[in-house]
């Protein structure tokens, strides 16, 4: 076998180890927010997944602008915790990206479902116009592992109401 053929075969049959790396872009409202929780947009060349949606709809709107500015297709929003500072900001995101699936582990979904109304009753008056007028309960993740533009992402500690995410190619933990 010639070197040229060997090089061609190696190129054709090598897995996507040379795929473009994922970009990790974090938003945190800092002192402007009631809770300085981070939301992270992880994207490849075409796709993007948002991890956590902020506490207020105002910060959710800032995420909408960040995602639009990326030029990527938002496929999914993963909620890593059942606490409202991770999902109250979903309303503007769902309006802007209606095709994006909102997902979480079963335990996170159960926690949100069980506590969302009481949390909104408590926090809504304090948040004033930053409070959501509509709450979203995520769908249960079909699998704790999924891909972003060919790169593996794993949701860890799925038995907890506060999971975390491992992105091996970016050597990143979120949540």
Regions found by a protein language model. Give the residues of each.
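Conserved beta-strand hairpin/beta-sheet module of binuclear metal-dependent hydrolase folds
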Residues: 20-69, 163-175
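Gram-negative bacterial Sec-dependent N-terminal signal peptides
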Residues: 1-18
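Active-site environment of divalent metal-dependent phosphoester hydrolases
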Residues: 35-36, 57-59, 82-87, 109-112, ...
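Short catalytic-loop micro-motif centered on adjacent basic/acidic residues
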Residues: 49-52, 75-80, 154-155
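Extracytoplasmic
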Residues: 22, 37, 72, 79, ...
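Metallo-beta-lactamase
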Residues: 113-162, 167-169
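Binuclear metal-dependent hydrolase catalytic cores
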Residues: 96-121
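Active-site metal-binding motif and surrounding structural segment of the metallo-beta-lactamase
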Residues: 58-104
